[in-house]
Amino acid sequence: MAKIDFAHKAQRKMFEVVLDAAIKHSDSDRRKALMQLVDLIEKTLGDVWGPAAYKMFRDIFSDPDSKWMKYANNLLDDVHPNIIKGKGLNTGLEAGFRGFHIAQEQKKKHGVSIPWLVLVDPTSACNLKCTGCWSAEYGHLIQLSYEDLDRIVTEGEELGIHAWLMTGGEPLIRKKDILKLAEAHPYSSFHLFTNGTLIDDEFCEEVVRLGNIAPSISLEGFEEVNDLRRGKGVFQKVMRAMDIMKKHKLLFGTSICYTSANYKTVTSDEFLQML
């Protein structure tokens, strides 16, 4: 983990207190806490966005019937508080604001642009053989050691990068190393693109404890279409994984590859409601 100074810790604690208030309260008190969060961001880190952006957020949080306020309520009510704080602080404060400032300084120093996020493949190995996937075509032998992963994230944090996407192969084949990495870098945010078949209660408990991991599950549509590409039984395994993640109140999404064969299905109300 990159070096963290006292002022940084104090600033992070301020944001955490306001986030706590938004999580614990409801209705008008929650909206008040979210307004305070916008005020705090504008006061301490306001030069990242223009005035119009802060006005937009105030308009959203002042209207209890806006779709975005309803979405915020769903997140704050349905996702575990530790994940809300971990992902919110790391993706927002560390990556979006503090990281942006550091990246701009590093850009001037080194004369190159610094990315906001980095995509890493911990392994080319996968437990599935999906039609058309490069992993099935090129083999399962390419690995990044834990030491390499740790070095990459440490060097990235020093440049202001705190957002990390992980694909593969299947990243959760390296489940233990990913959890170890997330624990070693508590101020970074890790987003995993996974087939979902290796997600279990033990993994979800660790994700809740750490607070800085969110998975996106690959899905091609309903069972028949999905399993045609990914293999028989995979759809039901994904449904079980989603049930487990919901039980533990994880933040997660889906990664959908749309084609001429499934685009109508994956954009249908029925499919989106299932998610």
Set out the residue ranges of the language-model regions:
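Conserved alpha-helical substructure of the radical SAM core
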Residues: M35-H191, T197-E202
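Radical SAM/AdoMet-radical enzyme domain recognition
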Residues: Y146-M166, L172-L275
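Radical SAM enzyme [4Fe-4S]-AdoMet core and its adjacent flexible, acidic
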Residues: M1-K55, D59-D63, D227-L275
